[in-house]
Amino acid sequence: MNLAKIARKIVEYALEGKDYEIPDEIKEKLNYKAGAFTTIKTLDNQLRGCMGIPYPIYPLWQSLKYSALMAAFEDPRFPPLQKEELDNVKFEVTVLTPPRKLIVNNPLEYLEKIKIGKHGIIIKRGPYSGLLLPQVPIEEGWDAKEFLSYGCLKAGLPMDCWLDPKTEVYVFEGQIFEED
């Protein structure tokens, strides 16, 4: 079962003004709580939308539906996806494990605890938070320090906010589904 293909179908239906009803047999397999993000990229790998549900508060089938619709139509960095663009984009879905707070005595320990290619991160301080998926530092060629710094930026905080003991760092893992 390719979740990226289901995400595409959800968006295709929405562009027709319809609600895609995920088949019951698929819903049954995806009826456990999990976070999910949908990433939409152009065929030349430019980001076109990426949004999702970071925490396991909905059944996966519902997180998938929400994330697909948000990535296509609500990502504030991009205009809503248009029907004409469908042939020129690819969908990717990342299913997230529950985020786990990293406990450190010194913020520099984050550099050892975060595993590039395995962990995604959530940076939180006060009302601010930013999430980066596990595949992002690989795609961008970042080390752990750059990953943390860009996580801070994503949260709308200074790039070195991860060095502040008041900043919380969470890690999660992701299972990635891509279109063929």
From Swiss-Prot:
UniProt-listed Gene3D superfamilies: Hypothetical protein ph0010, domain 1, Hypothetical protein ph0010, domain 2
Alphabetical list of InterPro entries matching this protein: AMMECR1 (IPR023473), AMMECR1_dom_sf (IPR036071), AMMECR1_domain (IPR002733), AMMECR1_N (IPR027485), AmmeMemoSam_A (IPR027623), Uncharacterised_MJ0810 (IPR023472)
Disulfide-bonded cysteines: none
PROSITE patterns: AMMECR1
Family matches, as Pfam families: AMMECR1 (PF01871)
TM region positions: none
Source species, domain of life: Archaea
Residue ranges constituting the AMMECR1 domain according to the UniProt record: 1-180
Entry protein name: Protein NEQ441
Source organism of the structure: Nanoarchaeum equitans (strain Kin4-M)
